[in-house]
Amino acid sequence: PDDYMMKPFSQEQLRLRLLRALNRKQQLLPMLTAFQSADTEQVLVECKKIISQNSRYANYCRCIMAEIYLEQNRAQEAKQILNEGLAVRESAWLRLFLGRATQQLGDHDAAIVHLHSALQLRPFMVDAYRWLAYSQLAIGASEEAIATLERAVSISPQSGRLHQQIAEHCLSQHDYFRAKQSLATLLDLHRYAVDDNPQILGSYIHCVILHAINNQDPYHIGNLQKQVNTALSRCRDSLINHDFDFHTFEHICQARVQMARGNLPKGKQLLYKSTQDYLDTPETMSSEILSETILAMLQLGEFEFADQLQKSLPPEQAKDPLLTQCIQSIRSDTVITERRNQYQLSNELGI
């Protein structure tokens, strides 16, 4: 970027970079001022002015406009403004946003073509890999989607967003091992982000449990308690002094371990005992405790109760893609479904 001034080779190069950055800020000042004020309509007006002047920053403004249009679900208008830019000259960024626009319109095959074109122009464009994976997954090419994301991770290994996206895709395919690996990396990247840690930790433990249940090797079930305890121990110091009920969270996780090991009565008893102060008033629960309780109830087979609790989730938490995939994965997992059915049948028979 023009503003990037790390390790200039000479004073002259530094001077030129500063001049370019200053010139850019001056030309884009009205648009940037509107952007900072969150006045999206004025941003669109200023971008159109800059584009009409055939400025060197015209394509940059087209991308800004496309981003706003996509946020407002106006993909057709975004597509039009991007095609106008591509008619002048090819651009990786315009191709990226055109891929996103066609993706929002539901044409995933065309989106894949545009995103591949962007990557041919810029092979290290991580965002293009991310959106390409969404379209590949939408057309059923799940392995290609995961491979695309793994390629992006090799370029940007510190990107938490990429690791979370891999985990979401793997959960949707019931590939708990790879989801667990990605979440372990994500947990490590967020080890000092106390606000994000509980949700990531809960998702990681969820994947550890489902991987152990679905694996035919009894070693994984036998080692499950140790893995969960290790994960909880790693985050205990940072969370226990924070405004977070770590003890309840830990007991819910231990209840899920007991269920996974086949001891459903003990798991159920521990779950209800640890959450008894909250279940009558779920709105008083933190979103992390609530989401973990929902997953535990689903694992136990208490679908109606879980659905009631799910309605109490804060709006932003209810839309969280990682939590959504965790809930969907446990609802559709065949091994857990068989165990629940067997447990319910035993109860009906009085066993």
Roles of regions detected by a PLM:
Residues 7:
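A Lys-centered signature of the CheY-like receiver
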